[in-house]
Amino acid sequence: MASMISDAIIGKNLGWKFEYLTGGYANYPIDEIKEIAKNISMVYGEKIWINLGILEEKDMDKLKPYVKGICASIETVEEKLHNSLCPDKSIKPYSEMLKLAKKKGFKTSITIVIGIGEKKEDINLLFDFIKEHKIDKITFYALKPVKGTEFENVNSPNCEYYSWWIKKTREKFPNLGIIAGLTPKKVDYVKSILEAGADTLTKFPSIRLFNSEKAKSIEKQAESANRKLEGSLTKLPNIDWDKEVEKLDIDDETKKTVKEKLNQALIRMSSKKLS
């Protein structure tokens, strides 16, 4: 918990948006997830997004005081491709969850991976899905080949193809929130995906690569695309970080641990990066 609070404090004060609570937390008891959401929400001063698999209505109700949006990792809306890649999680339960979330007043979002075998004509299926479910936000990810998977020897989509999906989606939905995933190996994509219509970048390890050459490249490319980043990837604010911890309504022992984690992270972020 302390590490998550520490990261949230850094993110808030550097102007980084919190995309969503996800990952292994899906296996946590709902009350523990609620506590995590409560603390991150407290740091940011607003409700957060979550991406935790299929949520039941009773769990949505428990999380609602701290959660404003629910994301579904659809990956692809082309059903045959989806069923071949994700045989254990069909689209239907996610579809039902998104519709229920909307009825209960949540914002909704989906994630889509580009480069997994989809075709350009599948974009019309994506548009239909967005309209049917009244999606507020979409996150695109470019396939990252992972050793030991069926995509181990598949190349990531090139910049032009990845940007095409973003551009066409932006043209169809001018008011849709569009987030584009970015890996350290693909920082040269930034200018193109911002010009294509992405609002936000995600997946870049901002703390680990803070003030690195790659972080500097992202800022330069954003400027070249005539886009101003809301936060900084290269400059730490001159603030009293301990005061940021003291503001929080958490117990003294947790505060002490958060301060330790925060100090460790800030030392790493202040060191010179060569990559």
Protein language model annotation of sequence segments:
Residues 1-6, 121-125:
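Glycine-rich anion/phosphate-binding loops
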Residues 133-275:
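Auxiliary Fe-S-binding modules of radical SAM enzymes
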Residues 1-5, 11-32, 36, 40-96, ...:
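Core AdoMet radical
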Residues 25-27, 52-58, 76-78, 114-118, ...:
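Active-site-proximal loop/turn and secondary-structure-junction residues that shape catalytic pockets
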Residues 18-21, 92-150, 161-179:
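Conserved C-terminal portion of the radical SAM core fold
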Residues 56-66, 116-131, 184-196:
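Catalytic cores of alpha/beta
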